[in-house]
């Protein structure tokens, strides 16, 4: 089965990572951003769905890549109540690329595990050019 990918957080880094994977033949099915116009524009460009909820992004992908700004944003997308990436997460893989505190990564890993999902820490170094070129 071919992996389907969702991106959560499609600012400059997330959007360029999504573009790169799409250009390389990967199936990017969903994008989500707290600033909806970013997701809408990128979705139109790469042929993905601009999700209105985090749960919808989880539903549409087997691999969910998160590229959010900080601890608060990471905790919000992995909330235990309400709209969350954890809704329907059983069997999914989260790859968390945000640079957040070690405790947040541990907390997210525990929440994912509790939901039947897996979570990997994949912090990045470099910038937008490297994201677009695939050299992070």
Spans of model-derived segments:
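Alpha-helical structural signal in soluble globular domains
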Residues: 42-45, 80, 84, 107, ...
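NAD(P)+-binding Rossmann beta1-loop-alpha1 motif at the extreme N-terminus of oxidoreductases
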Residues: 1-67, 92-93, 131
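Rossmann-like NAD(P)-binding element
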Residues: 51-105
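Short gly/ser/thr-rich secondary-structure transition/capping motifs
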Residues: 45-51, 75-79, 117-122
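Short helix-capping segments at alpha-helix termini
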Residues: 25, 86-90, 113-117
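Fold-independent oxyanion-binding glycine-rich loops
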Residues: 34, 54, 97-98, 122-124
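Rossmann-fold dinucleotide-binding core
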Residues: 5, 99-136
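Short glycine-/acidic-enriched loop or helix-start segments at secondary-structure transitions
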Residues: 14-17, 75-77, 104-107, 131
């Amino acid at each position: 089965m071919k992996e389907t990918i969702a991106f959560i957080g499609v600012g400059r880094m997330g959007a360029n990572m999504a573009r790169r994977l799409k250009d390389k033949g990967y199936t990017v099915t969903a994008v989500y951003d707290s600033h909806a116009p970013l997701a809408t524009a990128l979705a139109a460009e790469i042929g993905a769905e601009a999700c209105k909820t985090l749960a919808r992004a989880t539903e549409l992908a087997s691999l969910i890549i998160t590229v959010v700004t900080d601890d608060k944003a990471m905790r919000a997308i992995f909330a235990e109540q309400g709209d969350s990436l954890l809704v329907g997460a059983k069997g999914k893989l989260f790859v968390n690329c945000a640079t957040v505190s070690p405790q947040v990564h541990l907390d997210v890993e525990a929440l994912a595990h509790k939901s039947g999902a897996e979570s990997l820490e994949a912090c990045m170094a470099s910038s937008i050019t490297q994201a677009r070129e695939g050299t992070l």
